[in-house]
Amino acid sequence: GSEMCIRDRKEYAERGYIHAVALDLSKYFDTLNHEILLNILRRNVRDERVIQWIKRYLKSGVMENGVVMETEEGSPQGGNLSPLLANIYLNEFDQEYQKRGVVFVRYADDIVLLAKSERAAKRLLETSTKYLEGPLKLKVNQEKSRVVSVFAIRTFKFLGFTLGKNGKGIYVRVHGKSWKKMKSKLKELSSRRSVQSIRPALAKIKVYMCGWLNYYGIAEMKNRIEELNKWLYHRIRMCIWKQWKKPRTKVKNLRKMGVPEDLAWQAGNSRRGYWFTTQTVAVNMAMTKERLISSGFYDLAIAYQSVHVNC
C-alpha cells in the first residue's frame, strides 16, 4: 500500500539514496497497448476464454461527445478491472528494473527511481524513459519527469508526501500542496456562512479529517496539527457565536454555561468582530474543549497522536 511505499522511500534515503527520478507518464490509462497487455496475460493465464473476455473489455470503447468509440489502446477509466490491468502492465517495468538492481518505489503509475548520485539518477532517467517508450510503448512526459533531491519539498512529491531532514535524522512530512488542500477543505466545512447546524457540521469535519489522518498519519507533524487544532476550535466557536445572533441570547447562553454575569454581559454586548470576541475569557469558559468534544468535535491532536503511534 501507499504507507509501505513511503516507509520504503524513507529507508532508502537513510541508506544514501537521496537523488530521485520522478517519472510522469502521459495519459497512462489511455495509452496501454492492448497487444502487449494481452501477451503479458497469456504468459500467466492459460484459459484463452479469460483472455478473450479481457480483450472485449479493453475494446469496449470510451464515450466521446455522447458517442461510444472503439479503442485500440488504453483501458476504460472507471472500470473495475482497469486498475488491476494497469498494474499488471507496469509489473513488466518492475521485473526489468529489479533484474537491473535499481532501487525504486512504484504505486500505480507513480514511479520513483532512486540513486546515490545525481549522475546515476540522470542515467536512470534516460534508460527508464527508453524502456517505457520502447518495449512498453508508453509516453513519458519529458517536461514533468525530472531528477530531484528527495528533500526538495517544492519540486518533489510522492503520494502527497515528501521527506525532511534535521539533527535527529530523516523524517516523513506532508507535502505543502497536500496540507494546503486539506486546510482549504476545513475552511469550507467550518465556514460561518455554510454551517447551519453545529452537530452535522462537526460530523462532516470528523469524517473528512479521520480519513485524512488515517492516510497522512505516518508523517511527523505534531506541532502543525496542534496549531491547526487550535485554529479549528476557534472557527467552531465563531460558528456557534454567530448562531446565537442577538446580544440577549449570547448573554443568556453564556450564563447557562457558568460564565459570571459581568463577563457574560461584556462579551454578549461586544461590538468587536467574531474572531476577537470568541477569544475572550467568557467564550472560552463557556465553549471549553471538553464541552465541544462532547458535542462531536473531532480533536485533531488526540486523533493524530493515536494514528501516529500506530503507524
Regions inferred by a protein language model and the residue ranges of each:
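Short, small-residue-biased leader/transition segments that mark boundaries at the very start
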Residues: G1-C5
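Generic amphipathic alpha-helical segments used as scaffolds and interaction surfaces in large
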Residues: Y28, L41, V45, N80, ...
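Structural signal for well-ordered, non-membrane alpha-helices
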Residues: D94, T129, E133, K187, ...
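Extended C-terminal regions of large enzymes
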Residues: R235, W244-C311
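Non-catalytic, peripheral interaction segments enriched in hydrophobic/basic residues
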Residues: A201-P247, V251-R255
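A conserved non-catalytic segment of reverse transcriptases
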Residues: K59, P135-A203, Y208-C210
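Short hinge/gating elements
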Residues: E70-P76, E188-R192, Y215
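Conserved polymerase palm-domain catalytic core
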Residues: R7-T155
